[in-house]
């Protein structure tokens, strides 16, 4: 077997190994089941711990929450309501996103109130200090009153008010932009005869793990936060393993930030995040209450002293919506999606999208892909265009590799002569081969470069397609309605021509009866192999023969956008290699190699011809 075939087998085997490691490290996500939801409990989030001078009286539990009035939320992108009990933002759905591809399916619900399975909500309040007690400040069970009337909408804020009956009047003004950012201004007016001290807080609470938790290694789901430039990600299982902190009365992690930051819960596509005023110290808390199975993310801001007759105000923000790249980036860079006076940028907010280990590749790859999609108007065509750009970027390295492959073919007659002279002396053969390579300035390992280069690109593109919402339900053409999902077609029903349904995704039948796109992938890999003749060794020839079809089944249930990339990449590689090798005097006999692959006994060809047409040189028989 010549060194070129050795290199090709090595590169192919390495790719196979990488895919196997990928399946081991990143197994397919567990099927989302509609199992028993977390038992609905009337207990709400645990109030923050007292400030240093505050009493340590615990917030009273709310065993029976009364029905309270609600204020509607209605914007171009959001609908829901705010509960007057605690002023909680606990009912929110995303108008622009449906649960399935069916436009008649339910829209995605992000937040839900206590009393429903897996309650998920945000609330704000004040922690008392000094002589104040928890009964003197608004908390999770305070019944607020709306000042005025009307729903919360863009440019239509709502104002809530609560009087503690002891001279303190609390006001909360909530506004929302045309995307997913809420602004919350908390005001306390001191009409008592003495100064008071208190500290504002915000809480995002989840009762139990999400029903649609994917538990996928490549995806982060759980708490995500940033404090003074450091990003932290904590999965739900790790939150439940946090050490007990006596002062918090729960398992917790407490981080003191001096300059900027944010914290909240992230899902694959959605996020709810507390954003305190930037440029000022605050405390970030991740908490788990095991008895109630409540996960919490909190922000606590600095202690405020309000003199008699004075008023204090603290503003913060809450992001609750889809992790759209353009929207998140606008909040990071400008503080708003539209030019807004006084809007504070949110440092590092783009990192709330899970870019993964290869962030230095995934970020620029997605930026270019997003731009191409904006220019072309079709995500599938954008992936194809991105593939061409990536291949052009690595063309200089690929060119050297293909030139080296062509020159290796030119050396085959000399290598055959070396094998004849060396006989069974492997040391002599190796030494003479190295001398020949050095003399002819040929690198026998250069043929591996094209495959090695595309491995990190493949992983990065997989990450981009898997986690970015811009790929969710993004169509291509024909039957490919969602490039973030596997090809829905199946050979089982002749790609939809037969009157019976395709196998259910995730079943063994679906693994066997793959779709049209994976089959095209296998054909493209098989065609790429035909640039070179099959190895003379039967075992190696069998490996080559089976490799494209093994990859076809292994990658058949990856996202169709990724399979599309691989097909186009294979076709471009085939064209590049063919043109470059011909320009250097080597003429691959593609049709001859295809014909030979269907023959039981491929015909041997003279050694001189083999160097030019891609056929393996015939071995001389000993007399």
From Swiss-Prot:
It is a multi-pass membrane protein. InterPro entries: Membr_insert_YidC, Membr_insert_YidC_N, YidC/ALB3/OXA1/COX18, YidC/Oxa/ALB_C, YidC_ALB_C, YidC_periplasmic_sf. Residues 33-64, 601-623 are annotated as: Disordered. GO terms for cellular component: plasma membrane. GO terms for biological process: protein insertion into membrane; protein transport. Required for the insertion and/or proper folding and/or complex formation of integral membrane proteins into the membrane. Involved in integration of membrane proteins that insert both dependently and independently of the Sec translocase complex, as well as at least some lipoproteins. Aids folding of multispanning membrane proteins. Interacts with the Sec translocase complex via SecD. Specifically interacts with transmembrane segments of nascent integral membrane proteins during membrane integration. This is Membrane protein insertase YidC.
């Amino acid at each position: 077997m010549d060194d070129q075939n050795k290199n090709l087998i090595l590169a192919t085997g390495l790719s196979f190994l990488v895919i196997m490691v990928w399946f081991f490290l990143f197994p397919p996500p567990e099927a989302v089941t509609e199992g028993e939801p977390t038992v609905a409990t009337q207990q709400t989030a645990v109030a923050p711990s007292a400030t240093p001078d505050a009493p340590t009286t615990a917030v009273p539990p709310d065993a029976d929450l009364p029905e309270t009035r609600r204020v509607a939320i209605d914007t171009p992108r959001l609908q829901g309501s705010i509960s007057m009990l605690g002023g909680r933002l606990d009912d929110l759905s995303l108008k622009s996103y449906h649960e399935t591809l069916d436009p008649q399916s339910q829209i995605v619900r992000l937040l839900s109130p206590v009393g429903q399975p897996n309650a998920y909500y945000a609330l704000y309040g004040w922690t008392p200090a000094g002589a104040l007690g928890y009964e003197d400040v608004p908390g999770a069970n305070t019944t607020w009153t709306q000042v005025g009337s009307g729903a919360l909408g863009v440019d239509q804020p709502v104002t809530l008010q609560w009087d503690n009956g002891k001279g303190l009047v609390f006001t909360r003004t909530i506004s929302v932009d045309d995307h997913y950012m809420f602004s919350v201004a908390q005001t306390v007016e001191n009409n008592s005869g003495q100064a008071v001290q208190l500290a504002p807080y915000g809480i995002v609470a989840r009762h139990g793990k999400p029903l649609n938790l994917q538990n996928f290694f490549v995806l982060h789901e759980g708490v995500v936060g940033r404090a003074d430039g450091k990003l932290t990600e904590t999965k739900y299982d790790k939150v439940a393993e946090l050490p007990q902190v006596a002062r918090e009365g729960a398992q917790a992690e407490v981080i003191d930030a001096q300059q900027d930051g944010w914290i909240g819960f992230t899902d694959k596509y959605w996020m709810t995040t507390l954003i305190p005023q930037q440029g000022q110290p605050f405390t970030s808390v991740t908490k788990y209450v095991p008895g109630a199975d409540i996960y919490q993310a909190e922000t606590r801001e600095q202690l405020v002293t309000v003199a008699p007759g004075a008023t204090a105000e603290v503003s913060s923000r809450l992001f609750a919506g889809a992790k759209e790249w353009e929207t998140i980036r606008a909040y990071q860079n400008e503080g708003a999606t539209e030019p807004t006076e006084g809007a504070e940028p949110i440092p590092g907010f783009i990192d709330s999208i899970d870019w993964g280990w290869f962030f230095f590749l995934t970020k620029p790859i997605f930026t270019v892909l997003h731009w191409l999609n904006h220019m072309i108007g079709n995500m599938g065509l954008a992936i194809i265009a991105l593939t061409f750009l990536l291949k052009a970027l690595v063309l200089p390295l690929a060119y050297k590799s293909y030139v080296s492959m062509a020159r290796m073919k030119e050396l085959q007659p000399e290598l055959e002569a070396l094998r004849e002279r060396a006989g069974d002396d492997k040391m002599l053969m190796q030494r003479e081969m190295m001398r020949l390579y050095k003399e002819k300035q040929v690198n026998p390992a250069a043929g591996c470069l094209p495959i090695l280069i595309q491995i990190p690109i493949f992983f990065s593109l997989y990450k981009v397609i898997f986690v970015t919402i811009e790929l969710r339900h993004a169509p291509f053409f024909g039957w490919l309605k969602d490039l973030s999902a596997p090809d829905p077609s199946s050979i089982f029903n002749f790609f939809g021509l037969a009157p019976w349904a395709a196998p259910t995704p995730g079943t063994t039948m679906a693994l066997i009866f793959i779709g049209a796109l994976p089959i095209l992938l296998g054909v493209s890999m098989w065609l790429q192999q035909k640039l070179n003749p099959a190895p003379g060794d039967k075992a190696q020839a069998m490996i080559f023969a089976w490799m494209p079809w093994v990859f076809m089944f292994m990658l058949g249930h990856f996202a169709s956008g990724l399979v599309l990339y691989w097909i186009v990449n294979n076709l471009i590689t085939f064209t590049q290699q063919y043109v470059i090798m011909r320009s250097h005097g080597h003429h691959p006999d593609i049709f001859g190699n295809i014909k030979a692959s269907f023959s039981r006994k491929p015909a041997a060809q003279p050694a001189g011809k083999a160097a030019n047409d891609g056929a393996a040189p015939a071995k001389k028989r000993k007399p």
